A protein has these predicted regions:
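C-terminal catalytic/acceptor-binding lobe
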Residues: 3-18, 167-219
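Conserved beta-strand scaffold positions in the cores of enzyme catalytic domains, especially
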Residues: 84-86, 110, 143
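N-proximal low-complexity "stem/linker" segments adjacent to membrane-targeting elements
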Residues: 1-51
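Short beta-strand-to-loop acidic/aromatic patch adjacent to the donor-nucleotide binding site
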Residues: 106-122
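Short, high-confidence coil segments that cap the C-terminus of an alpha-helix
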Residues: 58, 107, 140-141
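Active-site nucleotide-sugar/metal-binding loop of Leloir-type enzymes
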Residues: 94-109
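Conserved catalytic core of nucleotide-sugar-dependent glycosyltransferases
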Residues: 93-95, 120-200
Length: 219
């Protein structure tokens, strides 16, 4: 990370730390945190993710649809038990921040994830509760989330080696700066005062569920 990015990150962390003191969060329980799922033309993984979340007791789910055109998905939306926000155009992974929904969700704790990121079967069911507690323990951390599981990436995935190399470098770096380790979780900061991430409990590509701290930042 460059000196400029490090400085910017640290300033941002202090800014949101002070905002949290001045205007405390209204969220007291992890199950109250809204989960916004960014989706484009994915049905199978979307349903698997929502089923996994609800099975763990996390039901405050919203789907942000990036102008999907897949007929079976559009049909599913008609009976979907969750609120679906339909965008008029595909705004990509930054859709939440580029849409008016930013004002609704990004002024307190929120979870923003892709629809193809599924917690592994051996992931503890209280993972969001755990993330929430750990984020509270680290007041200068702005977000927290899974890291990728890389032992099951298919050879057909063209970026396999790139992902493995990147995750390996991050793991080696973070082991040297580990902030806490338990028999269930291994927490690791990815950058100074910016992010705490958990070892492989996510079984899908490309990124992981992240819990940004109140009033921003996110993956």
């Amino acid at each position: 990370m460059s000196i400029f990015k490090t400085l910017t990150c640290n300033i941002g962390s202090y800014y949101y730390f002070l905002r949290e003191i001045i205007s405390p969060s209204l969220i007291r329980d992890a199950k109250e945190i809204p989960i916004i799922i960014n989706n484009f033309n994915r049905l199978t993984t979307l349903r698997l993710l929502t089923e996994t979340l609800t099975a763990c007791g996390y039901t405050n789910i919203y789907i942000l649809d990036n102008a999907s055109t897949y007929p079976p998905l559009l049909e599913y939306y008609k009976t979907c038990p969750f609120t679906v926000f339909h965008l008029n155009q595909n705004l990509g992974f930054k859709a939440l921040w580029k849409s008016p929904l930013k004002k609704r969700f990004c002024n307190d704790y929120y979870i923003y994830t892709d629809s193809d990121v599924i917690p592994s079967d051996y992931c503890p069911k209280d993972f969001i509760d755990y993330f929430f507690k750990e984020l509270k323990k680290h007041p200068f951390a702005r977000k927290i989330g899974f890291s990728l599981r890389i032992d099951n990436i298919p050879d057909s995935y063209i970026h396999k080696e790139e992902v493995i190399n990147l995750e390996t470098i991050l793991s080696q770096t973070c082991r040297r700066r580990s902030v806490q380790s338990t028999n269930r979780y291994n927490l690791r900061p990815l950058s100074p005062s910016c992010r705490i991430e958990q070892k492989p409990f996510s079984r899908s590509l490309p990124n992981s569920i992240s819990l940004p701290s109140r009033t921003f930042a996110l993956v």
